Amino acid sequence: MEEDSLYLGGEWQFNHFSKLTSSRPDAAFAEIQRTSLPEKSPLSCETRVDLCDDLAPVARQLAPREKLPLSNRRPAAVGAGLQNMGNTCYVNASLQCLTYTPPLANYMLSREHSQTCHRHKGCMLCTMQAHITRALHNPGHVIQPSQALAAGFHRGKQEDAHEFLMFTVDAMKKACLPGHKQVDHHSKDTTLIHQIFGGYWRSQIKCLHCHGISDTFDPYLDIALDIQAAQSVQQALEQLVKPEELNGENAYHCGVCLQRAPASKMLTLLTSAKVLILVLKRFSDVTGNKIAKNVQYPECLDMQPYMSQPNTGPLVYVLYAVLVHAGWSCHNGHYFSYVKAQEGQWYKMDDAEVTASSITSVLSQQAYVLFYIQKSEWERHSESVSRGREPRALGAEDTDRRATQGELKRDHPCLQAPELDEHLVERATQESTLDHWKFLQEQNKTKPEFNVRKVEGTLPPDVLVIHQSKYKCGMKNHHPEQQSSLLNLSSSTPTHQESMNTGTLASLRGRARRSKGKNKHSKRALLVCQ
């Protein structure tokens, strides 16, 4: 992994005698010695943020929070399925969760980045913009993810989905900094990606001898939860912020009274992200074996009890995506995900197969990674749908939007590049050949321990399969009457209205004929269950 990705990054430290373990050992920090303070007079959350801003002089040049384009641009319906190119289910499951992250999707659909970035090749933001745009605007199709999305990560075998997820998030974060390569770590933590996924921990140690307080602030992009002794996400969070007593051999060397004395240590959230990525630690760091236990997680999660300022009212998050692993090790088995489309319907995204699901099914999974968004943000997106506002076309003229983009361009790191022509933007969506991936897959392919396509062999009686994967062995065994009702959606297929008028479904025989038209996508079969 990249050294400044994943869990804790660079730190802001107050009284440097207390220091959290950081994945960036070279991170710079500020030191402020604080003498004994009254118990009820800690720095306020706002004061801490102001101090942090002072440590990041170019922060407002990277991605101003007040100018983050979060207006709704997403289509209401579910988008495309993703083709499995050989042991890439972990890639597909992670990409679907990111695709249905509202703030990220809205920013990508605005094409703000591609209009100002001059390094399309090797830029993860440009690559993700092309992928999200294609996925959301091609419902009923199966698309192939670009090789560039997993370049430098995929080695022809299955990898850990959470590691790939954070690899991608970290690469997007770095893509925000091409014009500010010399900025300090604090400024890097103000990028657009950090504004969406990032927040700050506060680790506070209080000396019980002189009552001196030492605070350390660390940025995060995701939160790892120990589930060994937890039955729910709330219990895991409570354990994470539970005060720890430091005494005896673990006594604290106070930087205020300069004595070795008993102390209390508490880890809390100074600021919480717009989008929370909660990873349940299901795999052993040594053996990779899985902790296969049910851990309850809610549809709505109040994060206020885990904040540094716990008495300021509810801070409610709503679930919008779940990444699931089926199997016994992080290096085998199968990954898939559940996502919540803008209209509020849940869907199971299993490679090429997109199936309507229910919240009951979503909440009954052995989840690996949970995605929550602040309720106020989700309701704002849902409100635009309920009012019947259709998403604007990508090239639509909008005075307010253009004004906002103009303000952002003056502060964005990729500002000096000329605006791209349409064919240059389209070029970013083109994919190179997959021969290299297939070659690596054949050379390194290991025989699976079980048939990963039979993870869920049965379908609920009221399920609606929007499009069907090529892996139909499980359905043939459990739903032969449904398998026989597949609609042939080749290039000669009648229109949707004609099919509904006739009321008949043709049997799918053989593979669908490839379309010869430019930029055509293969159609998917439609399965209707009574």
UniProtKB/Swiss-Prot annotation:
Compositional bias ranges of the Basic residues kind: 510-524
Domain USP span(s) in chain numbering: 80-375
Entry GO CC: cytosol; endoplasmic reticulum; nucleus
Biological function: Deubiquitinating enzyme that removes conjugated ubiquitin from specific proteins to regulate different cellular processes that may include cell proliferation, progression through the cell cycle, apoptosis, cell migration, and the cellular response to viral infection.
Encoding gene, per UniProt annotation: USP17L21
Basic and acidic residues bias (residue ranges): 382-392, 398-412
Protein name, as recorded: Ubiquitin carboxyl-terminal hydrolase 17-like protein 21
Protein family according to the UniProt entry: Belongs to the peptidase C19 family. USP17 subfamily.
PANTHER family in alphabetical order: INACTIVE UBIQUITIN CARBOXYL-TERMINAL HYDROLASE 17-LIKE PROTEIN 4-RELATED, UBIQUITIN CARBOXYL-TERMINAL HYDROLASE
E.C. number: 3.4.19.12
